[in-house]
């Protein structure tokens, strides 16, 4: 992996093409995600969004109208809109001066993440620009798992800079926990991940369809499957076991579903609670508990690590993240926190810093093969 050289921004200008005009790239009411906002903070006055690619032009126009009325208008005032990456790449054929320094891909997973035509957006770009820099949101694909691993092998042919949007790896409490584990040479015996989401403002209809979103584990709990692997290592996928509360169970009836769930076929309705367990190849055990039961807006999240004499607990990943550590020296926990830490900012600072040559490639903490392993675990849990 090398720093981007293809049309690297001259004169201090950094050109970005954004794929997707939806919530992950431009924000939603029920969460802190807003990729464009973080890119704006990292790049400041040097940012120029030269392309916004989205199949619905009216969505692109709505976003651009809002941006051009804001204090970052300078970055969007000359943005061109396209309905597909194919159309955009055809434009670049005759306008090489507009080749971007990076692509920000934040769209549903149906269009990328494998080698199948129509779902191979990464390859579509890299065949023309093999040194391109791609930031790809999770989940990496909706294709069969083997398709994602096929793409892992194809990507080895290119010199692309690729970062997957597992932002929690970049939290300072997570990195502090990684350092604590390494410094104390801990042999992790168990990881316990808990993710309780607030559902009443999640009014994206596709999210409530199993076949469209992939289900809540693939779409949402994926973050904590990823963190579990980050600390626990590779999973023995033959050991995965799952229990769940479904929509038709008495305790699965939700009072404030923000969409007309009756319009969704019964076989497509998503589970309310999922409990999964597995063994890592190291012999350790992993546990995941995910729910869509909370109301309001705040999520409740926690990841625990257990090792001989040590208990490491990370909480409130979407709010004010805190790290609790109990060691053999004392029964009481010590608390470590980093006020106002923003993992979204941290991941884009790392990605863009590598593209600019400010950081070594190792600053990117989630590569495509990491994303493929996480996707594999979430699909096995979902299909179990």
Curated annotation (Swiss-Prot):
GO cellular component terms listed in the entry, alphabetical order: cytosol; nucleus
Pfam families: GFO_IDH_MocA, ox_reductase_C
GO molecular function: nucleotide binding
TM stretches of this protein: none
InterPro entries xrefs: Gfo/Idh/MocA-like_OxRdtase_N, Gfo/Idh/MocA_Oxidoreductase, OxRdtase_put_C
Family, as annotated: To S.pombe SpAC2E11.17.
Descriptive protein name: Uncharacterized protein C12C2.04
